[in-house]
Regions:
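Short N-terminal "domain-start" leader segments
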Residues: 1-56
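A short, exposed loop/beta-hairpin motif centered on an aromatic-Gly-Thr core
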Residues: 62-77
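Short arginine-rich
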Residues: 69, 83-98
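Short acidic DE-rich linear segments
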Residues: 104-107
Length: 107
């Protein structure tokens, strides 16, 4: 995995960290950690989420593919998971490098 860019945060979207990466499989992903609410929810509700979205090379969604969504009750745990996910991105999502096709001789 290669980090392409730490994206600027959008405060109104309650973003805490937003990272644009390229996986071992050559596809592009956004890793986003954010607060689910702008108010204090009841204690039985998770308050933060980290998710991964598959994107095109410019970071736009072509289809909504989210290979990972995880919710947390504490902001520090969500941010720690975001960092851990970046460190072990390919292993966590079980990404493999694309197979190289050999060129046929004579063509």
């Amino acid at each position: 995995m290669k980090i392409l860019q730490e994206l600027p945060l959008v405060e109104r979207a309650r973003q805490l960290r937003h990272t644009f990466v390229e996986g071992l499989d050559g596809k592009h992903y956004k890793v986003l950690t954010f607060a689910l609410y702008d108010f204090k929810p009841p204690p039985e509700f998770a308050t933060h989420e980290t998710n991964v979205e598959e994107t095109n090379e410019r970071g736009g969604r072509t289809v909504l593919i989210q290979p990972l969504i995880k919710r947390f009750f504490r902001e520090d745990e969500a941010l720690a998971f975001h960092q851990e996910l970046l460190e072990k991105f390919d292993e966590t999502l079980r990404l493999k490098a694309p197979e190289k096709k050999e060129a046929k001789a004579g063509h």
